[in-house]
């Protein structure tokens, strides 16, 4: 630890976002960057704690104290080596991870000014690319074993990357026209520029990984799986959670009611150069938009709606409003705090409401015009089970020409596969964070290696 008093003398400084009046007119990344000097000062605040709770909280087990120290000292190559010893794709997590490590940081308990780990790791990996530290590996020794990875989201990419470095010949099958999964087709460009994904894919291809696009493997068709097993020694299923949670309220069939990914994935494809007919296009332009669901996907819909030129945005959530402030007494540090989160998209403008139940979608001539909702309360269950929903007041109507359902995804069910077939990421565990999917992918790569090589 180079400066043991830095956390006392230097306050947390975030890079912040581009001005709202600028960023809502384009899909460029909203987050700014600090200067190298400022970034090194932020890294110096890391105390190299005796018990590094940041390491405990990170699903990847990132060595934040070690690479923060190297960053502070200006040894960017060492910082890069330490960072990538646990994290295969810091350029992804450095942009979109909620930074579980920061909430568990000892400084967060001390003064609610944790180290800026997420921004630090993004700075390290971008410096590594800029300085040429990252080059395709040419020392990989092949072991003669072949592995198929089905699905090129963060879990599949992490699995493929690790297996390839272990010497396996890896082929990735992806149903879409490009790799990335929700990194590419769910997360907006204003949070993650897709050129960042393409840069990593070029590196993986140069190191020997084969990608087959537009190739959907029907996991319910045993012939598809049998054919893969004939050609590969092991198969990894990393297909994510493709089924969004629906809302079966009356009027669901009206034109204008869509899943969140209908908007998000199409917008990302439009930015990539794909064209859609007027009938196919899902757009918020000139419309009153209602987002149902209070999570990150709903937030992404808000930011996208603003950039498309919506008239207004309202976000409703059936659960109570989270605690405001740095921590919730019900789940104390170092746990992840269940507190109110305000994103860059929320800052761009929206009405947020909690304890709102959706009753009915309303329309005229087959087109959505509004949504009937009901304010509710959650009361304790005398039997100790799930809280009881109690209606308050009278139903009301929220005007809307576009509704976006952002209520999460259903965990897929899988049959019992042969021993050489592995499942990882969201496909195995249900919808979660990109960092958890990557960690699952890395763990699965180790399981495959142990199975095939002993």
Question: Residue locations for each model-derived region?
Answer:
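A ubiquitous short alpha-helical element
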Residues: 9-12, 48-53, 87, 194-195
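Glycine-rich phosphate/pyrophosphate-binding beta-alpha loops
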Residues: 45-51, 88-90, 429-434
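Iron-sulfur cluster-binding cysteine motifs and their immediate structural context
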Residues: 48-73, 93-124, 171, 178, ...
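Short amphipathic alpha-helical segments with coiled-coil-like heptad repeat character
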Residues: 46-50, 113-114, 199, 365-367
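Ferredoxin-type iron-sulfur electron-transfer modules in oxidoreductases and energy-metabolism complexes
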Residues: 24-41, 63-95, 111-139
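Residues forming the flavin
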Residues: 1-37, 42, 121-454
């Amino acid at each position: 630890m180079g400066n043991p008093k830095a956390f006392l003398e230097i306050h947390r400084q975030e890079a912040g976002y581009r001005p709202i009046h600028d960023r809502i007119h384009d899909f460029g990344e909203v987050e700014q960057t600090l200067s190298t000097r400022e970034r090194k000062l932020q890294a110096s605040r890391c105390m190299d704690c005796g018990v590094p709770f940041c390491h405990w909280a990170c699903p990847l087990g990132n060595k934040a104290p070690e690479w923060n120290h190297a960053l502070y000292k200006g040894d960017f190559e060492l910082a890069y080596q330490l960072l990538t010893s646990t994290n295969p794709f810091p350029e992804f997590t450095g942009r979109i991870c909620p930074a579980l490590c920061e909430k568990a940081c000892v400084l967060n308990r001390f003064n609610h000014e944790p180290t800026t780990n997420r921004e630090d790791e993004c700075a390290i990996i971008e410096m590594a690319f800029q300085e040429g530290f990252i080059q395709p590996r040419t020392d990989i020794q092949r072991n003669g074993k072949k592995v198929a990875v089905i699905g090129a989201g963060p879990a599949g990419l992490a699995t493929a990357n690790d297996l390839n470095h272990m010497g396996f010949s890896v082929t990735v099958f992806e149903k879409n026209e490009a790799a990335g999964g929700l990194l590419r087709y769910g997360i907006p460009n204003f949070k993650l520029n897709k050129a960042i994904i393409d840069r990593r894919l070029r590196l993986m291809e140069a190191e020997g990984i084969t990608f087959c696009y537009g190739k959907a493997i029907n996991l319910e068709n045993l012939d598809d799986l049998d054919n893969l097993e004939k050609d590969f020694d092991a198969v990894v299923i990393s297909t994510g959670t493709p089924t969004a949670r629906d809302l079966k309220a009356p009027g669901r069939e009206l034109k204008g009611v869509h899943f969140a990914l209908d908007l998000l994935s199409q917008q990302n494809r439009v930015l990539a150069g794909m064209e859609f007919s007027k009938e196919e296009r899902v757009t918020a332009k000139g419309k009153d938009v209602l987002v149902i669901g209070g999570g990150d996907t709903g937030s992404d819909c808000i930011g996208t709606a603003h950039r498309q030129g919506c008239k207004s945005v309202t976000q409703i959530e059936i659960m109570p409003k989270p605690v405001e402030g740095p921590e919730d007494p019900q789940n104390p540090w170092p746990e992840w705090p269940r507190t109110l989160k305000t994103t860059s998209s929320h800052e761009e403008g929206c009405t947020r409401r909690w304890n709102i139940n959706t009753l009915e979608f309303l329309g005229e001539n087959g087109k959505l015009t509004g949504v009937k909702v009901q304010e509710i309360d959650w009361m304790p269950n005398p039997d100790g089970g799930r809280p009881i929903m109690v209606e308050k007041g009278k139903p009301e109507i929220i005007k809307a020409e576009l509704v976006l359902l952002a209520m999460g995804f259903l965990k897929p069910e899988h049959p019992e596969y042969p021993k050489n077939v592995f499942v990882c990421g969201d496909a195995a565990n249900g919808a979660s964070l990109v960092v958890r999917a990557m960690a699952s992918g890395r763990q699965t790569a180790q399981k495959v290696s142990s199975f095939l090589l002993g």
